[in-house]
Amino acid sequence: MSSGDLDANSYQTIPFLKDQIKNKGYKFDQAFKTVAYPMGVYSKKIKSLKDLKDGDSIAVPNDASNETRGLQLFEKAGIIKLKKGVGQTATKKDVVSNPKHLKIIELEASQLPKQLGEVTAAAINTNFAMGAGLSINENAIFHEPLKNNPYPNVFVVQSGHKNDAVIKKIDKYYHSKQTAAFIKKEFKGSVVLSSSK
């Protein structure tokens, strides 16, 4: 998109988009929210996060937006605590409470499913979990909310074009009953349609 070859794309969350704009200087606008891929915690070794033992290992994605998301997921589960006010920039250095002395391992997001047997539990993005045959509804031992997920993907356009008629039309089709039915049937709850705004 930055080269002008594309007018729009749809694959990133808002924190990821903001990080890319900040670090790479892209001139993009968020047009509308599309779908959410709720992040889940998966394990081959435990059935519940309550089963974590002292010194066990947990893994999170190592890219800026998804590491924060994974750490926040473990925090929501009551496993760790992050520094107050850290927002969308948390890394493992921002963990202020880790009562079970868990080893927090940062790995490339796409590698997390392959490394699942090497750690006690891992926070995995749904697209990579699905690619490994994992279902958030059937295999995750903890996950982000499926409805009103705080990390929807967004439809992104070149700066100054978010109110173009064609973009409004795409938004309308994206949020139609037919699209909602397709997503529900195709992804069986692992991907959920977000409200437009």
Predicted regions, residues:
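A conserved helix-loop-strand patch within extracytoplasmic ligand-binding domains
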Residues: 31-80, 180
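Periplasmic-binding protein-like
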Residues: 68-75, 174-194
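Short amphipathic alpha-helical coupling segments at ligand-binding clamshell hinges
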Residues: 54-56, 162-173
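A bilobed periplasmic-binding-protein/Venus flytrap-type ligand-binding module shared by bacterial periplasmic
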Residues: 38-49, 151-164
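A local structural motif
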Residues: 54, 79-106
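Short helices/loops that flank or line small-molecule/ion binding pockets
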Residues: 1-7, 22, 72-73, 93-123, ...
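Short, glycine-/small- and polar/acidic-enriched structural segments
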Residues: 2-47, 95
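Ligand-binding "clamshell"
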Residues: 19-31, 44-46, 118, 123, ...
